[in-house]
């Protein structure tokens, strides 16, 4: 694994315990039992007053001074939706569930850090799976970064770079490197094992 090149932009990917399971893999077509388990996981999280966003598959760091990110897979999306709804005393409808399970894309959200408020504009993200580059369907960035806790010291600003990737374009079981190309130059690589993520 290559060490990240930071320069004036620091990028990382966050990993937390959320939905990680040794026998899991990113499910492109979840079975009914997997859907039920994901919904139950969300209800249980709500019963324990756990924040819905803790159910995403995270990578990197999770504090304000270091960059990070998360994946929104179908099963994670179901758990998060069930948590949100259960916290309001509601149940997801069949249409709600179908909307998540039939989603054609997976979202990858990262936070990068830099030293000027527009440093993230025109940043880009790809997935590398053993030399095969997967391009995103969409990439969105914060046009105006927010101040980091380090302000006025470096890194002064935090901004999101969010991309969606079509499930049919990548291998949901492959070791994958998320590569972010900051607009200010350079590249940063973070390696994940999609086989370990639900």
Predicted regions and their residues:
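N-terminal secretory signal peptides that target proteins for export/translocation
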Residues: 1-6
